[in-house]
Each structure stands twice: as structure tokens, then as C-alpha cells.
Curated annotation (Swiss-Prot):
Coiled coil: none
Motif extent (Nuclear export signal): 63-71
Disulfide bonds: none
Stretches the record annotates as DNA-binding: 37-65
PTM comment: Mono-ADP-ribosylated, leading to inhibit transcription activator activity of AHR.
Subcellular location(s) of the protein: Cytoplasm; Nucleus
Residue segments, region Disordered: 1-38, 425-452
Role, per record: Ligand-activated transcription factor that enables cells to adapt to changing conditions by sensing compounds from the environment, diet, microbiome and cellular metabolism, and which plays important roles in development, immunity and cancer. Upon ligand binding, translocates into the nucleus, where it heterodimerizes with ARNT and induces transcription by binding to xenobiotic response elements (XRE). Regulates a variety of biological processes, including angiogenesis, hematopoiesis, drug and lipid metabolism, cell motility and immune modulation.
Species, as recorded: Mus spretus (Western Mediterranean mouse)
Pfam families noted in UniProt: HLH, PAS, PAS_3
CC per GO annotation: cytoplasm; nuclear aryl hydrocarbon receptor complex; nucleus
Gene: Ahr
Protein name: Aryl hydrocarbon receptor
């Protein structure tokens, strides 16, 4: 076999001829060149002969003179074969068969053979004994990339791989032994295959045509322009050897040679195609480009698929104008790879067809060399469906930091892709050579960039090709959506102004009902002019239509309605982490403690009423004594400490009860306005007579407590020389002393643990978290039944005189009196333990000097 340097394969050898123009006949008397006249007549005859060939006009226009002659001879030989093969018998020449022949001619007009070729997974190939392609069907282009006119009457060895040429020659011989031929051995070593066989067989030397060993089935590799890996495609040949009639060949002596055997086979790809390849194999088209991808030619199928004529395709400039903006960089990467390696590989992108339609194609481009230099590009495209294109787009590996298709880089909504400093310099011409006229243009135009650049191709594209026509029956209007947004903004403004959550919910429900009523009118009333609306196009691309908007509005309405119905339930999103979680825990502890202390409230109440009656008698005896004149000062100081608590905001805890204002003889109620409990429902049960208090004190845990006795007298008894006092709830100035909670005056009466009367110990209300060493809770109040004025109690000091009291305070140092450290927290009464004694002489409150409150 010859070396690899002498091996050549089939390639496109055709070149586009110069367009022929009809020249006028010269006038008489003017001399003309006889050889030129001869060439002109020859060209005219060749053009007329080419027009008779059974090929499309675009193929005929690209044929050279030798190709026209070659195809003409091949056509005549094929016609001779069919004339002999289909020749009827002498019995058929009777007149009775003429009508059947006429019907056959009518059936032939249906082009049934073309449909059979399309349904066939392969192409038909007829090869003579001297290895010339006698016939190849037009479907060879779908598998090998060669057109029918490229291979007919050419050597078949130009298509076969060098390692498979010997096997193909063996299959052409009827006995599978081509070595019997004298000159066949040297033929395979030649560059273009073996020469014409020197031995011809007579029918007596050959077996019958229908013999079983005349069948052939073998495999070999054929040259393929569509393959992107090896350049060869493994094909399976299945057929038989048959006589090739009507060739009328003559031998060296001039004698007519008998018909010789030829291989009639069907070549199918060894790897079966997929369903999609079977469906789209007949739509493969090819385009020819310059090295900068400017199209310079397109075949008939490409014009049919894209809708352009060859003139329209070749006069637009850069081929990137026909590529989608999201695929330009991807195609440019394949273009650079093709320039470096000679082949681009399979590239999937979108091509712009006529009437602003995008077609997904799978393309493979190759460099074609001439004289050792790249000359042009041949690109083979196979149309894809939209589903296949989207699948390839998802699999595409994006090496760039952004992607055009997702909207991250807007190409058509900006005035300039560069900053003013980076504006490209204009091309200086004769008209702007002067300095005063020369200035950089800030606005990019088609002339601002290189004609073959990607940016120039993007600017030259029309923006309308990326706008999809509206097709949804329920369009959207921007005015409607903007109105919804404005109404949503008004909801937020009203909510910020009122601060009421219920008002917000009511407003949302009302608005949702109005929108649903508006939507019930139909799209024709809401969206009269919106077919060309950009917002509508965007919503249509997102798959949102009229029914989706209606369902979203209904969803919002039902969600708001259910929220309003469940307003009394606890919403964990509204819980304040710093304050209300502690309140929730405290409520849980209260509920567990109240169950244990409920059984003890009734005997305590009865015992307290007896003690209050005894205390009332003692206080009436003290009314006769003369009170000291400075008794009013501590009373006023105590009231000033209480009054600032009346100005607390609605966030703080309020007691669902009423206090008595202080009058001299009959106790007058302390009218505190009852406010709604917004967040805290801890003391909502303080309306009954048997009040439940949350905490039980620990015995012997308090170092010191004062003994006091409850009474049924007013809180501040009036003395003989004092005037009546009435303390309004909000007319006092704030005191400089630490403020206390209102709950200090609603503390329960404390009962000792071990008492001779047999009364069970009752827990007092626990105070909050801080202790103050300089103040004492002097009064405790218990709410009466059915919102009646509470009975007031008075502390009685066991040590006579204020100085003794102060000395005891200073000696002990620590009291169990507690006050709230934060106004936002809930105040409680002081926790005390000890024994109650019936005092013989109880000193009134004015004996306590103000020094105890410093």
C-alpha cells in the first residue's frame, strides 16, 4: 500500500463560476476572434445541457464544465440501464397494455420514490465493477455531507477509508477473490483506487443472477463531512450483485462487451439514529461563510427553513446579525476554536429566520483550505425543536460572569455600553480632519465599531426581534397593576397613621373585595388597549394570565379573612422577645398556683371581715383625740408618689378595678379610668370577691417584717382639726422619689402562717424584681366584690414614735418591701410573713415622719 502522503479523499472540488451574461451580437463589418466565437458557442451548449440535468437550479449554477459533462454522461448511462431493465417483453408490446402504461406514467408523477427514500434509514448506492459510483441517491447528503452531484461517476475509493478499500474491492468480485484479476493487485495501491478491471466475464462464466452467494452484507467506513470526531462514518452495506444492463461498453478490439456485475446496496449507519434524528434528517442545510463568518452562500434547504433568499442572506453583512444575543458569545467561542483547530464542534444556538422567528439549530463548522491556507468556512446546520434547544441551553456551561438570556446584562435598554472615557474614537475622514470639527462622539452608532465586531452586530439588530407577539386571551394592563401597587402603598400609610391592626385588616379585606368585583367584569373592561404593552409581554413570558391574577386576589382575600376571624388567637410573630415571653411564663406559673390557692380564699375572707370590724371600733375611739398638725405632710408625700402612676401609657398593666378617692369619714372611691388590656391579661380575674394571688411566700426566708392589723376604716383618717382631702387621679406633679406601681395599693392583706385563730396562711402578691432600701409600701388594698370601693388598711407601728421606727429600720437594714424596677413590667405587692396582733393602741399614720421615705 502507498504511504499516507499520497492518500486523498473526496472533497468539494467545485467552484462557483462567473455569472454568464448574454453578449450582444456584434455589428456587421466588425472583425471577431474565431476561437472566441467557438468558446462562446461551447459555453452556450454547456449551459443548455446543464439545464437538462435532473438537479435543482442552485446545484446547476455551481457546476463547472467538467462536472456538467460528467453528470450528463452519468444520466445517459442511467437512462440506458432503466430502458433495458424496464423494457417490456414482446407479449407486452400488444395494444392491450398501452392503457396500463399510461396509468403507470400517472403514478410516476406522484414521486413515490422520493417518499421511499425519505422513509429509508440510509441511501442507495450502485457501484460498478471498476469501482465507479454509478448512482447515489440524494439522501447521501444527510449522512455523509456530500451532495449527489459530487459523488456520481466518481471513484468510490475516494469515499472509503484506506484500511477498508481492500475489503470493499473483495466484495465487488462475484467470487470474493479479486486477486485473480491480473491488474487488480496494483490498483488498490494507487491514490484513486484500482484502475478499470482488465478481465471481463461472459454470462457463461458467471453464476445466475439470483444465486444466494451473490448477496452481500459488510461494513466499512466512509468519508463524512458531518462527523466532528474522526471524519468517517461506519456504514453497513446490504444488497447483492446484479447485472448492469445497457452500458454498451466495448473492449480493446472494439467488440461489444456483455453486461457486467455491479453492487446494488443500501448503506445504513451502523449506529441507529434516534427518533429526533429520523424526523429532522431531511432538514439539514449548509451555509458557506468567509473567515469572519460573513455568509456567502446557502443551499436550497436552508432557504426553505430560514425563509431568506441567497441574496438576502449574503448582503446583510456579518453572520452574527442572525444569531441570538444570548448565544453570540457562545458562538464566538466556537468560532475561535474552529480558527485554531480547524473545526468548531457541535454548537447549539438560535438563528434568526424571516419574519422575526428564532430557530434552534445544531451546527458544525469546518475550515476549508486552499493551497495550504484557510479559504472559507462550511457550516452544516440541523434544525432542533424548542424543547431540545432549551435543554441544551440549560446544559451549556457558562464561563462568563453573566448571561444575556436571564436579563443580567441589558443590551438594548442603555444608550451606551461604555463610559464617556471609554468611548471609541471616530474614524477620521476628509470631512473631519480639522481639529475644530474633530471630536469624539458620545453616542455609539453603527460606524463607531468595527463592522465585524460583536457589538456592531448587536447594534445592527432590530429590537423588535426580541419582542414576542401577544398570544394570551387574558392580557394584563400596566394601569391596573400600578393601581394595585398604589393601593397597597395607601394601606401601609393608613396603618402607620392609625397604628391599629384591626383597621389594617379591615382595609385589606375591603380592598380585596373591590379588586375581585373589578376582576369579575372581565378582561375587556379592564384592559382595553394593551396588546403592545411591554409589561403585558413580560407577564405573558412569565406565564401569568387573567385567571392567575384572579386566583391570587382570592387567595389574599381568604387569607386576610381567616386572619381577621382568628384575631383572638395568639400570633407568635407578634411576641416581643424582651418582654412578653416573660409575661407568658408568668401566666403559666400563675395558673398553676391559683388552682392550689382557690380553696383557701373563702375562710380568709370571713376572718378578715371580723378583724376589720374590730379595727373599726379602735379607730372610732382614736377619732376623739387631737391629731398633730404636721400629719398632712407625709400624706401629701405619699399621694405625690402615687399620682405619677396615673400617667402611664396603655402598654403597662392596668387593674380591672376601681380605687376609692380619700374622704375623711366615708371612704370615697379613687376613680382610676379603666383601660383596655391590650397585651397583658394577667389580672383580668380581679373582679370577684375570692381573689386568687399567684405566689406563696417561703416561711422564714424574710429577715424582717412589720406586724400590722387590717381594719375597715378609711385609708387616711381625718383628725379633728384637719380639712377634708380629696386626691384627684391626674392633678399632681411628678415626684422626685422613685415611682411605684398602682398595684402597690392593691396588695392583699397578709396573714401569718402560724395563727391562733386557725386560719391557713395566705400568700401575698409577689413584688417585681428590684428592692429599694429607702421606701416602704405603707398601704395595701384589696379589691371589693363587683367593682365596689376597696377596703383600705393602715399600717400600725409597734414602736411608738417616729424615731423608734427609724432606729428599727436602720438596725434591720433590709425589708421585704419591693417595688417595680421597670414601668413596663407588672407591679406586685410586697411579700411579708409574720403574726398579726390585735393592738391595744394603734398609732395613726401621721406619727411616721417623712424621714422614712428619703
Amino acid at each position: 500500500m502507498s504511504s499516507g502522503a499520497n492518500i486523498t479523499y473526496a472533497s468539494r472540488k467545485r467552484r462557483k463560476p462567473v455569472q454568464k451574461t448574454v453578449k450582444p451580437i456584434p455589428a456587421e463589418g466588425i472583425k471577431s476572434n474565431p476561437s472566441k466565437r467557438h468558446r462562446d458557442r461551447l459555453n452556450t451548449e454547456l449551459d443548455r445541457l446543464a439545464s437538462l440535468l435532473p438537479f435543482p437550479q442552485d446545484v446547476i449554477n455551481k457546476l463547472d464544465k467538467l462536472s456538467v459533462l460528467r453528470l450528463s454522461v452519468s444520466y445517459l448511462r442511467a437512462k440506458s440501464f432503466f430502458d433495458v431493465a424496464l423494457k417490456s417483453t414482446p407479449a407486452d408490446r400488444n395494444g392491450g397494455q398501452d392503457q396500463c402504461r399510461a396509468q403507470i406514467r400517472d403514478w410516476q408523477n406522484l414521486q413515490e420514490g422520493e417518499f421511499l427514500l425519505q422513509a429509508l434509514n440510509g441511501f442507495v448506492l450502485v457501484v460498478t465493477a471498476d469501482a465507479l459510483v454509478f448512482y447515489a441517491s440524494s439522501t447521501i447528503q444527510d449522512y455523509l455531507g456530500f451532495q449527489q452531484s459530487d459523488v456520481i461517476h466518481q471513484s468510490v475509493y475516494e469515499l472509503i477509508h484506506t484500511e477498508d478499500r481492500a475489503e470493499f474491492q473483495r466484495q465487488l468480485h462475484w467470487a470474493l477473490n479479486p486477486s485473480q484479476c491480473t491488474d487488480s493487485a496494483q490498483g488498490v495501491d494507487e491514490a484513486h483506487g484500482p484502475p478499470q478491471a482488465a478481465v471481463y466475464y461472459t454470462p457463461d462464466q458467471l453464476p445466475p443472477e439470483n444465486a444466494s452467494f451473490m448477496e452481500r452484507c459488510f461494513r466499512c467506513r466512509l468519508r463524512c463531512l458531518l462527523d466532528n470526531s474522526s471524519g468517517f462514518l461506519a456504514m453497513n452495506f446490504q444488497g447483492r450483485l446484479k447485472y448492469l444492463h445497457g452500458q454498451n461498453k466495448k473492449g480493446k478490439d472494439g467488440a461489444l462487451l456483455p453486461p457486467q456485475l455491479a453492487l446494488f446496496a443500501i448503506a445504513t449507519p451502523l449506529q441507529p439514529p434516534s427518533i429526533l434524528e429520523i424526523r429532522t434528517k431531511n432538514f439539514i442545510f449548509r451555509t458557506k461563510h468567509k473567515l469572519d463568518f460573513t455568509p456567502i452562500g446557502c443551499d436550497a434547504k436552508g432557504q426553505l427553513i430560514l425563509g431568506y433568499t441567497e441574496v438576502e442572506l449574503c448582503t446583510r453583512g456579518s453572520g452574527y446579525q442572525f444569531i441570538h444575543a444570548a448565544d453570540m458569545l457562545h458562538c464566538a467561542e466556537s468560532h475561535i476554536r474552529m480558527i485554531k483547530t480547524g473545526e468548531s464542534g457541535m454548537t447549539v444556538f438560535r438563528l434568526l429566520a424571516k419574519h422575526s422567528r428564532w430557530r434552534w439549530v445544531q451546527s458544525n463548522a469546518r475550515l476549508i483550505y486552499r493551497n495550504g491556507r484557510p479559504d472559507y468556512i462550511i457550516a452544516t446546520q440541523r434544525p432542533l425543536t424548542d424543547e431540545e434547544g432549551r435543554e441544551h441551553l440549560q446544559k451549556r456551561s457558562m464561563s462568563l460572569p453573566f448571561m444575556f438570556a436571564t436579563g443580567e446584562a441589558v443590551l438594548y435598554e442603555i444608550s451606551s455600553p461604555f463610559s464617556p472615557i471609554m468611548d471609541p474614537l471616530p474614524i477620521r475622514t476628509k470631512s473631519n480632519t480639522s481639529r475644530k470639527d474633530w471630536a469624539p462622539q458620545s453616542t455609539p452608532s453603527k460606524d463607531s465599531f468595527h463592522p465585524s465586531s460583536l457589538m456592531s452586530a448587536l447594534i445592527q439588530q432590530d429590537e423588535s426581534i426580541y419582542l414576542c407577539p401577544p398570544s394570551s386571551p387574558a392580557p394584563l394592563d400596566s394601569h391596573f397593576l400600578m393601581g394595585s401597587v398604589s393601593k397597597c402603598g395607601s394601606w401601609q400609610d393608613s396603618f402607620a397613621a392609625t397604628g391599629s391592626e384591626a383597621a389594617l385588616k379591615h382595609e385589606q379585606i375591603g380592598h380585596a373585595q373591590d379588586v375581585n368585583l373589578a376582576l369579575s367584569g372581565g378582561p375587556s373592561e379592564l384592559f382595553p388597549d394593551n396588546k403592545n404593552n411591554d409589561l403585558y409581554s413580560i407577564m405573558r413570558d412569565l406565564g401569568i394570565d387573567f385567571e392567575d391574577i384572579r386566583s391570587m386576589q382570592n387567595e389574599e382575600f381568604f387569607r386576610t379573612d381567616s386572619t381577621a376571624a382568628a384575631a383572638g388567637e395568639v400570633d407568635f410573630k407578634d411576641i416581643d422577645i424582651t418582654d412578653e415571653i416573660l409575661t407568658y411564663v408568668q401566666d403559666s406559673l400563675n395558673n398553676s398556683t391559683l388552682l392550689n390557692s382557690a380553696c383557701q380564699q373563702q375562710p380568709v375572707t370571713q376572718h378578715l371581715s371580723c378583724m376589720l370590724q374590730e379595727r373599726l371600733q379602735l379607730e372610732q375611739q382614736q377619732q376623739l383625740q387631737q391629731p398633730p398638725p404636721q400629719a398632712l405632710e407625709p400624706q401629701q408625700q405619699l399621694c405625690q408618689m402615687v399620682c405619677p402612676q396615673q400617667d402611664l401609657g396603655p402598654k403597662h398593666t392596668q387593674i380591672n378595678g376601681t380605687f376609692a378617692s380619700w374622704n375623711p369619714t366615708p371612704p370615697v372611691s379613687f376613680n382610676c379610668p379603666q383601660q383596655e388590656l391590650k397585651h397583658y391579661q394577667i389580672f383580668s380575674s380581679l373582679q370577684g370577691t375570692a381573689q386568687e394571688f399567684p405566689y406563696k411566700p417561703e416561711v422564714d426566708s424574710v429577715p424582717y417584717t412589720q406586724n400590722f392589723a387590717p381594719c375597715n376604716q378609711p385609708l387616711l383618717p381625718e383628725h379633728s382639726k384637719s380639712v377634708q382631702l380629696d386626691f384627684p387621679g391626674r392633678d399632681f406633679e411628678p415626684s422626685l422619689h422613685p415611682t411605684t406601681s398602682n398595684l402597690d395599693f392593691v396588695s392583699c392583706l397578709q396573714v401569718p402562717e402560724n395563727q391562733s385563730h386557725g386560719i391557713n396562711s395566705q400568700s401575698a402578691m409577689v413584688s417585681p424584681q428590684a428592692y429599694y432600701a429607702g421606701a416602704m409600701s405603707m398601704y395595701q388594698c384589696q379589691p371589693g366584690p363587683q367593682r365596689t370601693p376597696v377596703d383600705q388598711t393602715q399600717y400600725g407601728s409597734e414602736i411608738p414614735g417616729s424615731q423608734a421606727f427609724l432606729s428599727k429600720v436602720q438596725s434591720r437594714g433590709v425589708f421585704n418591701e419591693t417595688y417595680s424596677s421597670d414601668l413596663s413590667s407588672i407591679g406586685h405587692a410586697a411579700q411579708t410573713t409574720g403574726h398579726l396582733h390585735h393592738l391595744a393602741e394603734a398609732r395613726p399614720l401621721p406619727d411616721i415622719t417623712p424621714g422614712g421615705f428619703l
